Amino acid sequence: LENPLFGTVLDVWMSLRGDAIAPPWRVEDLLRYPVIVIPFISVVDVTPNGGFRYRFWGTGHVDVKGYDYTGHSPLDHEPPEYGRMINDEYQAVADAARPMAFVHDIRPGLTEISKYQETLRLPLANDGRTVSGVISFA
């Protein structure tokens, strides 16, 4: 990954997790990340049916992609194959219970030019043992 802030984000996540498999989601912990990355953070919760729902969608994502997905599923992204890819990334992180990085093109709209994006996805575990969400920086 080329973005030097990925190392900083990973360091903060590791300091928050302690001895657990992953840190819990706490709004106040978001402020431990560098101010410059917060607009480019998103957080999904694992839903009771095993899917994912965005709890937090940073304003930087709105600026770049043109949408606010707060309250939506990753499967709501367009085009549908992009939504499935994002959902599969969240599932991979939840299944592995470890940080993972992804590199892909994004298409903010169906007619717009694709943009290169690196994403770091890190699990969250409210009980310290079971993945309950994923925090991402892109």
Give the location of each predicted region.
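Intrinsically disordered, low-complexity terminal regulatory regions
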Residues: 1-77, 84-138
